[in-house]
């Protein structure tokens, strides 16, 4: 049985988040949670919570055995970019880009 979890508009760069997501794609849930728990990246803690949410969704759906769950697919898509300006010397300004991401996790039983 399939279980999904989505997180949208999270203030993380999609490029940096994909590095974390690539470490856990296709792994068993417990193994993925251990990898994410001990990763120093900011994205790791957010993906950890999202995988935990997907496991809770699977339990709510009535999956027989949570230990058999694995990450079938996990993807990071680009969200809207927040644009800000920072004042600089001599009346100039530079643009600051604050990227956002949409993360989707799909779990399935082996």
Curated annotation (Swiss-Prot):
CDD domains: Ribosomal_L22 (cd00336). GO terms for molecular function: rRNA binding; structural constituent of ribosome. One of its GO terms (cellular component) is cytosolic large ribosomal subunit. The keyword Ribonucleoprotein applies. GO terms for biological process: translation. SUPFAM superfamilies: Ribosomal protein L22 (SSF54843). Keywords: Ribonucleoprotein, Ribosomal protein, RNA-binding, rRNA-binding. Gene3D superfamilies: Ribosomal protein L22/L17 (3.90.470.10). Belongs to the universal ribosomal protein uL22 family. Part of the 50S ribosomal subunit. PANTHER family: CHLOROPLAST 50S RIBOSOMAL PROTEIN L22-RELATED (PTHR13501), LARGE RIBOSOMAL SUBUNIT PROTEIN UL22M (PTHR13501:SF8). This protein binds specifically to 23S rRNA; its binding is stimulated by other ribosomal proteins, e.g. L4, L17, and L20. It is important during the early stages of 50S assembly. It makes multiple contacts with different domains of the 23S rRNA in the assembled 50S subunit and ribosome. This is Large ribosomal subunit protein uL22. It comes from Syntrophotalea carbinolica (strain DSM 2380 / NBRC 103641 / GraBd1). The gene is rplV.
